A protein has these predicted regions:
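HDAC/HDAC-like amidohydrolase catalytic core signature
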Residues: 1-308
Length: 308
């Protein structure tokens, strides 16, 4: 089982204000834990800069232009109440998209069985025409559409276990039955979407979790909602929106998962990738704001990807 890792120094240069939870130290914590000899077999690749035209797979041109115009020449500019930009943010965003699309290329051409993209800023809150929740563009949605356009994937599944609902991914694929979107998330919690009755064209599966939910309820949601949907859909590619803020240490939510839960969930999705997708699985970093919880969870996730 070949596992590839994409990252890039530019991801550290997307600067947020002091005290902001989505900060460069998140990537530093991940880099430190993956430097351990246990991960020596990782195929480490510097993320390529993305093709800006692929942003249009998920977002209209006028919105893309507005976001680009909001990037400051110096200092920090506010995109919305939670989302800020610094001078290198555009390059970071474009490189994150480039890494995700390259990961899709890798799993379709056989260069890797699965790929983890350690990039920031995250993407799953970005709607078609709205940047929000620390997110500029929806990297997972762009990668899904890229797989369809570049590699002829007929069905792509996006599984999102970030503690916050991926309202952006749901918005983009709401009426697109060629993409399955499955989400486990705390509810009530930002952004307030993700109720069970939000089903789109029958391609949206939301499994909201009550505050203080632990391993048993999370795993039951996977077993009863997410995995049956994947088996019924039989995707050609599985993309994980891999947020690790459902970890019990995370300050932004109240779900009590451990790194073992992310190991288990990764294994379950790898089984489905083996069954339906020729092992093709791409994992994209989303949230996770306690540095220790994030590092331990990523280590468990990537370790499972490598074990097969």
């Amino acid at each position: 089982m070949t596992t590839r890792l994409y990252t890039h120094p530019i991801f550290l240069e997307h600067i947020t204000p002091p005290g902001h939870p989505e900060r460069p130290d998140r990537l530093r914590a991940i880099e430190r834990v993956l430097d351990d000899e246990a991960f020596a077999a990782l195929d480490r690749v510097k993320a390529p800069e993305g093709d800006e035209a692929t942003i249009l797979y998920a977002h209209p041109a006028d919105f893309v232009a507005r976001v680009r115009a909001a990037i400051p020449d110096e200092g920090i500019a506010r995109i919305d109440a939670d989302t800020t930009a610094s001078p290198k943010s555009w390059q970071a965003v474009i490189t994150a998209i480039g890494a995700a699309n390259a990961a899709v290329d890798d799993v379709f051409t056989g260069r890797a069985d699965n790929v983890f993209v350690a990039a920031r800023p995250p993407g799953h809150h970005a709607e078609k025409t709205t940047a929000m929740g620390f997110c500029f563009f929806n990297t997972a949605a762009i990668a899904a559409r890229y797989a369809q356009r570049k590699h002829g994937a007929e069905r792509v599944a996006v599984v999102d276990w970030d503690v916050h609902h991926g309202n952006g991914t749901q918005d983009i694929f709401w009426d697109d039955p060629s993409v399955l979107y499955c989400s486990t998330h705390q509810m009530p919690l930002y952004p307030g979407t993700g109720a069970k009755n939000e089903t789109g064209a029958g391609n949206i599966v939301n499994a909201p979790l009550a505050p203080q939910t632990g391993s048993e309820v999370f795993r039951d949601a996977f077993l009863s909602r997410v995995l049956p949907a994947l088996d019924n859909f039989a995707p050609d590619l599985i993309i994980i929106s891999a947020g690790f803020d459902a970890h019990h240490r995370d300050p932004l939510a109240e779900i009590n998962l451990t790194e073992d839960d992310f190991d288990w969930a990764t294994g379950q999705l790898m089984q489905r990738a083996s069954r339906h997708s020729g092992n093709r699985l791409v994992s994209l970093l989303e949230g996770g704001y306690d540095l220790q919880g994030l590092a331990f969870s990523v280590a468990a996730h990537v370790g499972r990807l490598m074990k097969g």
